[in-house]
Structure formats: C-alpha cells, structure tokens
Amino acid sequence: MAAGTLYTYPENWRAFKALIAAQYSGAQVRVLSAPPHFHFGQTNRTPEFLRKFPAGKVPAFEGDDGFCVFESNAIAYYVSNEELRGSTPEAAAQVVQWVSFADSDIVPPASTWVFPTLGIMHHNKQATENAKEEVKRILGLLDAHLKTRTFLVGERVTLADITVVCTLLWLYKQVLEPSFRQAFPNTNRWFLTCINQPQFRAVLGEVKLCEKMAQFDAKKFAESQPKKDTPRKEKGSREEKQKPQAERKEEKKAAAPAPEEEMDECEQALAAEPKAKDPFAHLPKSTFVLDEFKRKYSNEDTLSVALPYFWEHFDKDGWSLWYAEYRFPEELTQTFMSCNLITGMFQRLDKLRKNAFASVILFGTNNSSSISGIWVFRGQELAFPLSPDWQVDYESYTWRKLDPSSEETQTLVREYFAWEGAFQHVGKAFNQGKVFK
C-alpha cells in the first residue's frame, strides 16, 4: 500500500484526484500545502525540490520509500488499487480513456468559461460562448453514456469517475446553474452520486451546486492584476545623453526584469487570490507561542519535555482547550476508513494550523470504534465559525470546553498528547492517532 507526502497548494482540484483515490485504497497520504512545510512558488523552486521533481510542478508525491512522481493523474494512479485502475485489461483501458478525455476535452473549455468568473483571466465573449457550447457537448456525451450506467466504467467507482468529477467540479460550483444543467439529468445524477460517496466527501466536503451562473467582473479582474511601478522620470546627466543610442538600449535590456516563471491555470488562480484577512486579528496578543510547543512536541519526548513546556507556557486567557467526540460511531466500519475521516478533516482545516493543535485518536476495531480528541484553539470560542472553509466537519462532533486547571483536563491532555494511558472514558483500546499541527 502506498504511503507518502503530497506537496500542493490549498484547494488544488488536481490534488483532489489523488486524495480521493487514497480514501478508497487506504493509501496513507500526508498533505503539505502551507508554510512552513511548503510554500508554493518558493519551496517548489528550491534545488532540493527540483532534484526530486525536475518540473517543479505540483501536485508532487514523495513516497516514504523515496519514490517520487509528479503529474496529478500519475499520482492518483500510484495511490490507487486494482479496482480503481480497472480490474481487467478492457476496464483499465476505459479508465485511461476517460482520464485522457478529462484532460483533453473538459479542462480547456472549463478553464475558458470559469476562470474569468473568478477574476483570474480576462473575459473574451466569443471564446466564452464557444466554451459554453463545448461544455454542453461534453455534458451531453456523458449523459448519453450514463443513461444505463451508474458509473463511467463498470459497477463501482474508478479513477475515471474520480478524475472526471474533479475536472467538472468548478463548472458545477461556479457556472452550471439549474436551467443550464437540467438538460443533462443522467450526468447530474452521476455527479451527485459520486460527490456524496463518503470517500469523496472526506476530501471535497459538502459541494454546493451553482444557483446562479457567475459572470465576469471587470473590476475584480483589474484589482487582481499586479500593479506595475511607474517611477518618476529623472533628467539624465549630460554624459548619459551623450551615450550612443545602441549602448543605452543594451543597458535597458540588461536592467529589464526576468519574466516570471510560466504558471498553469490553477497556479495563476492561486496567485491571483486576494489575501484573506486573519480571522484571529481581533484577539489580543498572547504569550503562548504555539509553534514553539509544536517543535517541542515533534522533536522531543512528549511526557518529559513537551507536556511540561505546554503547561508552563499555556495562556488560558488567550487560548482554550476542547474535548471533541465523533457523533456517529455507529457509522464507523473499517478502521482505515475511520482514520481517513480524521485525515480528511485535517486537510480541510489546513489554514487553521497556525492557530490550532489537536491530537485525535481512533479507538477500537473494525465495526466497533470511536473517534475523540483534544484540541487547542486561539481564543475562548471554537474557531470553526470564523471561516466558512472550516465548517465542513465540526458539526459531526460534540465539543466540550475544558477547564485547564482541572485534574480531568490534565489527565485527558496527557493521555491524548502521549497516545498512552487508561482512557477510562472511552471503553475501547487505542488503535491509532493523528496529530494536527
């Protein structure tokens, strides 16, 4: 079974393919998508990264065994199992067919139509109208194919479904309003069936379909473009004026800035996104440095070093402790799938890492398990309501605020942070743990 690290930027639909495939196969995929572990545009240009991935592109996957591979379809294939890849030569060929179709037929018109509505590409009316017609053709083709089929290949989800769904994702979220998509009932049924599978939801969260077709906003586009400096012209010296024209041209060429590295459409989208406001900016400064505790926790003994440091420096006025428990233990079946629920939640909370820490544990065995954990948040309230991006999973848990001074809290923090202890409140044996840091 594959295991390793996926380098990407947040909300990269190309990376979703591999993450969903891993949910089905049980591959253990860690995601690095934010500083300090991965800074898109910087980390992927370092010599160390380029030695492993010469193209410098993301997503990129590094296996625990040292195996490296880039290109999203190749990564998704690698972390898949035989069922996803196609269990017969014929099925495998059909899977490759649809994966190729997504790249060659869906990505170009989808980009042409959707990207201007996001303010990251200029609008061309004729090109957009052509793209709409091409999308209609694609949805119609899929609709005819799916008239008597639940999935694209065979009777179960394959990489074909995963890839095509991810490629259509922004169309359904941004521009395929009800009046446009109603002509393709079989395609809609299939899309909804896929995104509501637990393995898809673990990665995508709740997908909200477009209610009103988004339009190009010229003002938004203008604001997203980098502003060029226009320095004041200074009168040149007499000697400068006397320089030969050819010599002055050469100097201008030498002084011209190097063109930026070419980015694909998704990288352009990321670069064009306005910087979000810090949801925690309203809070007073705290003496507790979470990153320093995380370093202690990662690099030194938990019981003898990290925990004493935590309690010595914890700021109970600037931070809060919470106990979380999964609401629906009866729905937990295979332990690897239960563990993937935790991983999926962590992935969707990636932008919260700077202001939170958690140790979440899966207890029990197949068909008899539970999930609970201890969370540390900046401020005195749950952090999730501060951003819509963080609200996908938290309502699936019960949350109880803890008193840092109580003996119960001291015990819970020790057991959950160290992954050892009686865990008397659980009634099941420790299976495995995940840390959000």
From Swiss-Prot:
SMART domains reported in the protein's UniProt record: EF1G
Extent of the signal sequence: none
Entry-linked CDD domains: GST_C_EF1Bgamma_like (cd03181), GST_N_EF1Bgamma (cd03044)
InterPro entries in UniProt: EF-GSTs, EF1B_G_C, EF1B_G_C_sf, Glutathione-S-Trfase_C-like, Glutathione-S-Trfase_C_sf, Glutathione_S-Trfase, Glutathione_S-Trfase_N, GST_C
Residue ranges of domain EF-1-gamma C-terminal in the record: 276-437
Keywords, comma-separated and alphabetical: Acetylation, Elongation factor, Isopeptide bond, Protein biosynthesis, Ubl conjugation
Modified residues (N-acetylalanine): 2
PTM sites of type N6-malonyllysine: 434
Modified residues (N6-acetyllysine): 147, 212, 401, 434
GO CC annotation terms, alphabetical: cytoplasm; nucleus
SUPFAM superfamilies linked to this entry: eEF1-gamma domain, GST C-terminal domain-like, Thioredoxin-like
Glycyl lysine isopeptide (Lys-Gly) (interchain with G-Cter in SUMO1) cross-link, renumbered residues: 253
Cross-link (Glycyl lysine isopeptide (Lys-Gly) (interchain with G-Cter in SUMO2)): 285
GO molecular function, one term: translation elongation factor activity
Pfam family name, one: GST_C
Domain GST N-terminal intervals: 2-87
Biased composition (Basic and acidic residues): 221-254
Domain GST C-terminal: 88-216
Stored Gene3D superfamilies: 1.20.1050.10, Glutaredoxin, Translation elongation factor EF1B, gamma chain, conserved domain
Region (Disordered): 221-268
Subunit structure: EF-1 is composed of four subunits: alpha, beta, delta, and gamma.
Role according to the record: Probably plays a role in anchoring the complex to other cellular components.
Protein's name according to its UniProt entry: Elongation factor 1-gamma
Species for this entry: Oryctolagus cuniculus
Gene: EEF1G
